[in-house]
Curated annotation (Swiss-Prot):
Keywords: Metal-binding, Pyrimidine biosynthesis, Zinc. One of its GO terms (molecular function) is metal ion binding. It comes from Bifidobacterium longum (strain NCC 2705). Zn(2+) binds at residues 101, 106, 130, 133. InterPro entries: Asp_carbamoyltransf_reg_N, Asp_carbamoylTrfase_reg, Asp_carbamoyltrfase_reg_C, Asp_carbatrfase_reg_C_sf, Asp_carbatrfase_reg_N_sf. This is Aspartate carbamoyltransferase regulatory chain.
């Protein structure tokens, strides 16, 4: 299989194998409306296998969201067919509007329009808790 290089855009590399569609969903990128290439279950020396997402044209992605859903991913910015910048997402201390609280008694569940906000409690376990009711977040 051959996937050619892109001239201008971004490459999200080292996405956990089989999760690229979920990553696109969390990044709010619609595959039906965006020129992109998905390479799934590619060989990786570091991880065994990985997914790669290539997005043509300028697309502003939220590195905090990417750090939350695909912590080990890297982002390469491509201009004129060459990588001009490499970015490494970090695990965010706070996430807003990415996931929803599962607690049926949480104010965010009962009241429409309240932003879903979570804070990092334990970085090794990737544990986030709701700012309002302290319920653990589920990805």
């Amino acid at each position: 299989m051959e996937v050619t290089s892109i001239q201008n855009g971004i490459i999200i590399d080292h996405v956990p194998a089989g999760t690229s569609l979920k990553v696109l969903e969390y990044l709010k990128i619609d595959p039906a409306k965006t020129k992109l290439a998905l390479i799934m279950n590619a060989d990786s020396k570091r991880y065994g296998s990985k997914d790669i997402i290539k997005i043509e044209d300028d697309k502003d992605i939220d590195l905090d969201v990417l750090g939350f859903v695909a912590r080990q991913a890297t982002v390469d910015v491509v201009r004129g067919g060459k990588i001009v910048e490499k970015k490494q997402p970090n695990l965010p201390e706070h996430i807003v509007g990415v996931i929803s609280c599962v607690n049926p008694r949480c104010v965010t569940t009962a009241e429409p329009g309240i932003k879903q906000m979570f804070h990092l409690v334990h970085s090794e376990r990737l544990e986030y808790r709701c700012d309002y009711c302290d319920e653990e977040a589920k990805l």
